[in-house]
Structures are given as structure tokens and as C-alpha cells.
């Protein structure tokens, strides 16, 4: 399970060091893709394969499903962390997430998110109220 908040630096070559506690779970390969809110999502390969299969099972006659699958496939990059636990983020991914040297990696239970540190802080400030007022209906009855 991926939990917590970490603040690695992005180096000049576009490499980001993944938190040490997640390296074993990601050692078999990982998939980096564009996510919502102009962040990046990092999935273990097996988890991403399940997501991709579900997306591919949607009706191809539905334009939204087709567009989602097309964008998901085109925006995904397979990575294998190096001996120091670093992955190289593509220029396209860095541009999409507007990443500076200061990044934030957050655990999102079954995947990781990579954010620019300033954008993550802004997101937290804008959505703080949502956390404390989340309704049971929107969270599928977990409370």
C-alpha cells in the first residue's frame, strides 16, 4: 500500500528518486502516466495492466471511452528504477505536471502521485475544506 508524503528533488536530467519504502513494490517495473489535476501517476506494472484491461474492455463505439484509452496508452511510459531508486521522467511528463526541482510524491493507496511542490501546496489549500466535509455518499459509505 502506498501512503505518505515525500519531497524528493528532480535533478537536471529529469530523474526523481522514489521513496525507499516503495522500491520493492516497484522493482518489477512501473508505469508513469498523466493523471488528473496536472499531476503524474506511478503504478506498479501489474496494477496498471489491470487498469488498462478495464479501459480496453469499454465499448470502443463510445467516443469518451475511445479517447480515454487512446490518451492513457499514449501518455504512459514504462520505467525501471535504477540502483539508487531513480526514474527518469520524460520531458512531456515534466511539462504536463509543470515540475520544478521541488517535487512531492504522495501515496494514493494503490499508486503514487508526483506533483510540483508549489502546485501540491496550492491544491491542499484549495481542497482542505473538502476533506473535512466529505459526505458518506461520495466516499461509498466508508464512514
Swiss-Prot record:
GO cellular component: cytoplasm; nucleoid
Pfam families per UniProt: MraZ
Domain SpoVT-AbrB span(s) in chain numbering: 5-47, 76-119
Keyword Disulfide bond listed: no
Predominant cellular place of this UniProt entry's protein: cytoplasm
Subunit-level organization: Forms oligomers.
Protein known as: Transcriptional regulator MraZ
Source species of the chain: Mycobacteroides abscessus (strain ATCC 19977 / DSM 44196 / CCUG 20993 / CIP 104536 / JCM 13569 / NCTC 13031 / TMC 1543 / L948) (Mycobacterium abscessus)
Gene: mraZ
Amino acid at each position: 500500500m502506498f501512503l505518505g508524503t515525500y519531497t524528493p528533488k528532480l535533478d537536471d536530467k529529469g530523474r526523481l528518486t522514489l521513496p525507499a519504502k516503495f522500491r520493492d513494490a516497484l522493482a518489477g517495473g512501473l508505469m508513469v502516466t498523466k493523471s488528473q489535476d496536472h499531476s503524474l501517476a506511478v503504478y506498479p506494472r501489474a496494477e496498471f495492466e489491470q487498469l488498462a484491461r478495464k479501459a480496453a474492455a469499454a465499448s470502443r463505439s463510445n467516443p469518451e471511452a475511445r479517447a480515454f484509452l487512446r490518451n492513457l496508452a499514449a501518455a504512459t511510459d514504462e520505467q525501471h528504477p535504477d540502483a539508487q531508486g531513480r526514474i527518469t521522467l520524460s520531458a512531456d511528463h515534466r511539462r504536463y505536471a509543470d515540475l520544478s526541482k521541488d517535487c512531492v510524491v504522495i501515496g494514493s493507496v494503490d499508486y503514487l502521485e508526483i506533483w510540483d511542490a508549489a502546485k501540491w501546496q496550492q491544491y491542499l489549500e484549495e481542497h482542505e475544506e473538502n476533506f473535512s466535509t466529505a459526505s458518506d455518499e461520495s466516499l461509498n459509505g466508508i464512514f
